[in-house]
Amino acid sequence: MKTVNSISGGKTSAYIAANYPADYNVFALVRTNDKNCMFPDKKIRQEVSDKLGNEFIGTLEMDTIIYTMLDLEQYIGKKIDWVTGKPFDEIILRNGKKYLPNVTQRFCTSEMKLQPLFDWWKKEINEVVEMRIGFRANEQSRAKNMLAKTNE
């Protein structure tokens, strides 16, 4: 069975990628088309665009996550597949209104992290895999809720 490490850019998933080799390492990036959030380094912006196969203007995550992922790829010595869904700006527009994520509607995780990961899996592998997702110990209830939603 093939293994996939889902990497968020955080410490837990970076630890998993560095210490638990997998057939694939995948990073789902939350993008924005807001020019006010433009990533400052033009060369890196182009490199990320090339990795995603989509124009990368900026991210709503900390800019350091981009450098962390590029460094992690070198550290583990294995390619990290970068995936992305619709930009945040498009997702929050629903029925002509802005719809922001909140405690009960955590669509950022499902639509901007998990869905692009599942889309990548279907295109690249499309068979049963062992998927490793890094949740911290204090996120157990969140992990259980996420698992329940993905099994629906």
Region roles according to the model:
Residues 1-152:
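ATP-dependent adenylation/nucleotidyltransferase module used to activate substrates
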